[in-house]
């Protein structure tokens, strides 16, 4: 069976692609026409009492933000920086090449001996 061949079940809406030869039928709108009647306006508008809706505060926190995190400070360069995911120390290089190293404890260097 090739493309565009129908196996029953109704008329394909893709006839415009495969050349059915018929124009698509326009959709029929069965919605009632809007009423032109107007509601009477009372001279004494009564105040409507609206119950206050309780809002769940936890639903207002964006995904990925932990409200009890100790690293919850505002960053100028965006929310997805720093140790927001792993709470591990940064691996960013803080010293210039050839300068002091924070890895002296591994390589036995440094110290004032």
Swiss-Prot record:
One of its GO terms (biological process) is cortical microtubule organization. Residues 23-34 have a biased composition (Low complexity). InterPro entries: SPR1/2/3/4/5 (IPR039613). The modification Phosphoserine is found at residue 69. Residues 1-50, 79-113 are annotated as: Disordered. Detected in pollen of mature flowers. Keywords: Microtubule, Phosphoprotein. Acts redundantly with SPR1 in maintaining the cortical microtubules organization essential for anisotropic cell growth. This is Protein SPIRAL1-like 1. It comes from Arabidopsis thaliana (Mouse-ear cress).
């Amino acid at each position: 069976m090739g493309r565009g061949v129908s196996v029953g079940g109704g008329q394909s809406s893709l006839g415009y692609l495969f050349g059915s030869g018929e124009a698509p039928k326009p959709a029929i709108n069965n919605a009632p026409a809007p009423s032109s009647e107007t509601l009477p306006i009372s001279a004494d508008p009564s105040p409507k009492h609206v119950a206050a809706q309780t809002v769940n505060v936890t639903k207002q926190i964006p995904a990925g933000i932990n409200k009890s995190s100790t690293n919850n400070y505002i960053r100028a360069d965006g929310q997805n920086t720093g140790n927001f995911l792993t709470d591990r120390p940064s691996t960013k290089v803080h010293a210039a090449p050839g300068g002091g190293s924070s890895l002296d404890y591994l390589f036995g260097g440094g110290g004032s001996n």
